[in-house]
Amino acid sequence: MNSIEFPLLDQTTKNSVISTTLNDLSNWSRLSSLWPLLYGTSCCFIEFASLIGSRFDFDRYGLVPRSSPRQADLILTAGTVTMKMAPSLVRLYEQMPEPKYVIAMGACTITGGMFSTDSYSTVRGVDKLIPVDVYLPGCPPKPEAIIDAITKLRKKISREIYENQMSSQRENRCFTTNHKFHIGYSTHTGNYGQELFYQLPSTSEIPSDTFF
């Protein structure tokens, strides 16, 4: 059997009692139950049609495509990501429960592809928006390469510790930002195209029932 199909064993007794850690057992249980969210935008996504057939047998890895990010733990991005689609992609990623993983499929997803030089509306790499676990280059990648990327992700899951993954994701860049709101009063100057000037009131002028 493959080494990634079983949790790491700490100790084995003569009575066939196996002891291991809770993290290893959790990682092992997730290996055969990855539920991907397929985020395809262009031609690379057509290669998934070959995986569904009997020749490559997409289901043998326990992959069940989901239409809701709240039921998925893997998002597979394939195709060009534009600036207008970036907030939607980040929102889908943030709605996925922990632990979650990302596979970037295709040259357009990884670097922007042929649109990376002179396009004003293309994201130069999906890793600028969400953290990526496995990069899958190609234009488009073959179905065998997709299976190899899934195998590499399964090996990564079998060796990782949940706490380490949580700390590493907090260090990655993210598209969303924390906004700070202040109460202010606008002063119109009467000139067209001129910005509003805001004056912060003193604390005595703020009502006691105001919430931030």
Swiss-Prot record:
<dbReference type="GO" id="GO:0048038">
    <property type="term" value="F:quinone binding"/>
</dbReference>
<comment type="similarity">
    <text>Belongs to the complex I 20 kDa subunit family.</text>
</comment>
<dbReference type="GO" id="GO:0051539">
    <property type="term" value="F:4 iron, 4 sulfur cluster binding"/>
</dbReference>
<keyword id="KW-0874">Quinone</keyword>
<dbReference type="GO" id="GO:0009535">
    <property type="term" value="C:chloroplast thylakoid membrane"/>
</dbReference>
<comment type="subunit">
    <text>NDH is composed of at least 16 different subunits, 5 of which are encoded in the nucleus.</text>
</comment>
<keyword id="KW-0934">Plastid</keyword>
<keyword id="KW-0521">NADP</keyword>
<feature type="binding site">
    <location>
        <position position="139"/>
    </location>
    <ligand>
        <name>[4Fe-4S] cluster</name>
    </ligand>
</feature>
<dbReference type="Pfam" id="PF01058">
    <property type="entry name" value="Oxidored_q6"/>
</dbReference>
<keyword id="KW-0150">Chloroplast</keyword>
<feature type="binding site">
    <location>
        <position position="43"/>
    </location>
    <ligand>
        <name>[4Fe-4S] cluster</name>
    </ligand>
</feature>
<protein>
    <recommendedName>
        <fullName>NAD(P)H-quinone oxidoreductase subunit K, chloroplastic</fullName>
        <ecNumber>7.1.1.-</ecNumber>
    </recommendedName>
</protein>
<dbReference type="GO" id="GO:0009060">
    <property type="term" value="P:aerobic respiration"/>
</dbReference>
<feature type="binding site">
    <location>
        <position position="108"/>
    </location>
    <ligand>
        <name>[4Fe-4S] cluster</name>
    </ligand>
</feature>
<keyword id="KW-0520">NAD</keyword>
<keyword id="KW-0813">Transport</keyword>
<comment type="function">
    <text>NDH shuttles electrons from NAD(P)H:plastoquinone, via FMN and iron-sulfur (Fe-S) centers, to quinones in the photosynthetic chain and possibly in a chloroplast respiratory chain. The immediate electron acceptor for the enzyme in this species is believed to be plastoquinone. Couples the redox reaction to proton translocation, and thus conserves the redox energy in a proton gradient.</text>
</comment>
<dbReference type="GO" id="GO:0005506">
    <property type="term" value="F:iron ion binding"/>
</dbReference>
<keyword id="KW-0411">Iron-sulfur</keyword>
<keyword id="KW-0004">4Fe-4S</keyword>
<keyword id="KW-0793">Thylakoid</keyword>
<dbReference type="GO" id="GO:0015990">
    <property type="term" value="P:electron transport coupled proton transport"/>
</dbReference>
<keyword id="KW-0479">Metal-binding</keyword>
<feature type="binding site">
    <location>
        <position position="44"/>
    </location>
    <ligand>
        <name>[4Fe-4S] cluster</name>
    </ligand>
</feature>
<dbReference type="InterPro" id="IPR006137">
    <property type="entry name" value="NADH_UbQ_OxRdtase-like_20kDa"/>
</dbReference>
<keyword id="KW-0618">Plastoquinone</keyword>
<keyword id="KW-1278">Translocase</keyword>
<keyword id="KW-0408">Iron</keyword>
<dbReference type="InterPro" id="IPR006138">
    <property type="entry name" value="NADH_UQ_OxRdtase_20Kd_su"/>
</dbReference>
<dbReference type="GO" id="GO:0008137">
    <property type="term" value="F:NADH dehydrogenase (ubiquinone) activity"/>
</dbReference>
<dbReference type="GO" id="GO:0019684">
    <property type="term" value="P:photosynthesis, light reaction"/>
</dbReference>
<keyword id="KW-0472">Membrane</keyword>
<dbReference type="GO" id="GO:0045271">
    <property type="term" value="C:respiratory chain complex I"/>
</dbReference>
